[in-house]
Amino acid sequence: MRQNPTEPQPHDPRLNHTAHGIFHQIFKVIGPGFVTGASDDDPSGIGTYTVAGASFGFATLWTALFTFPLMAAVQFMCAKIGMITGEGLAGVLRRHYRPGILYAAVCLLLVANTINAGADIGAIAAAINLLAPVSPRLLIVPISILIVLVQIWGSYRLIANAFKWLALSLVAYIGSAFFARPNLHEVLGATFVPTFKLEPQFLSVIVAIFGTTISPYLFFWQANQEVEEEIARGKRTLAERKGASTAELRYAAWDVNIGMLFSNIIMYFIILATGATLFRAGKTHIETAADAAQALQPLVGHFATTLLGIGLIGSGMLAVPILTGSSAYAVAETFGWEHGLDKKPRRASRFYILIAVSTLVGMFINFTRVNAITALFWTSVLNGFLAPPLLVLIMIISNNRTIMENHVNGRIANILGWTATVVMFAAAIALVFTWNQ
């Protein structure tokens, strides 16, 4: 999601250099990138990083440094595809490739998104339980219905503006990591010298980290939000939306990088904080949100559960509409149905029905006996298996001159994109082969 930068005019309120004016200007510029980055740190991400830090201490810190350029490159490719073609990924596949490829890609997305949405809904319920003594099972249905109603009769922008500030509470992991006083030599070594073990548990954590940082749902969402931005500026036909200037592409790259950097900073400090607290204390098996909250105790003490609860609610409410929305975009584009969050429900009824069905199917996943943290972690592992085939398609599309014209990938983008693809394939295959060892 991006905003087209404009030159400030003499009367532009952004020139107001009061604290409020500067804050408002920063908010407008980084807003879209921040929402994308914060939604990548959804409850499944938080759960995965918590398991990583609690299980292996600082051993996976290097993944934050390693995945940042990869995820930034992939997300910019998706943004560029939406900007140049004026369509989402499913629309591009429908127009330029065989139906079997399109259907396979959309099926992979639906499986990943529905399970991920279900796990995130469960995490929101568990987070509310941290704040009030209400059974999470009693909260699942009301939360799901609320999310559907807000998406259909409200707007995602309303959700994003309301809940991205709650997601900011995740910044507390940064403070907690410092207050826990980790060994600086160990931290630096784990950050810059990769540790790798051919063991099922370690490999599952690596696959999960890749799956939750380079996530299938963000591929489709990023491209579609570029299209939504164009429509919001009055470019309602495909011909009007096609193409982008160098300045627009440069700004989109900056916006994506800001969001992904924020996401990975939070990822790094969640692993660091949990490694310095839970792993050090010997609590390597995390089952509940209350267990995960202990990583924040060095900073806020008894308020740890409250702070984590707020963060999980904020990140979950950001992520679930993106998960269900990207599924709805993909299916609607596949069949040529009217779609878009700017459309009224009566005009794009099938699009909104898809959102509702995706949310409700995710809701029913929660009525199993799997605990919240386990569900979040294995959702990320699943994403780690489903993302690589979609990455192959993104790389093929972004190097197709018929589609991208003069904006095909450069050498660095191709190196980063194919590196992400190969590494994720390799990690998933290694996990399969070592599983029974």
PLM segments and residue spans:
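Flexible loop linkers connecting adjacent transmembrane helices
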Residues: 8-14, 48-51, 76-101, 126-128, ...
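Hydrophobic alpha-helical segments and their helix-loop junctions in multi-pass secondary transporters
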Residues: 168-199, 203, 209-228, 393-402, ...
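Hydrophobic transmembrane alpha-helices that form the core helical bundles
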Residues: 80, 84-85, 102-133, 140-144, ...
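Transmembrane alpha-helical segments of multi-pass small-molecule transport proteins
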Residues: 106-107, 131-153, 169-178, 349-362, ...
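Membrane-interface loop-to-helix entry segments
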Residues: 142, 151-181, 382, 387, ...
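Juxtamembrane transmembrane-helix boundary signature
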Residues: 35-36, 63-96, 104-115
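Loop-to-transmembrane helix boundary motifs in multi-pass membrane proteins
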Residues: 99-100, 137-140, 303, 307, ...
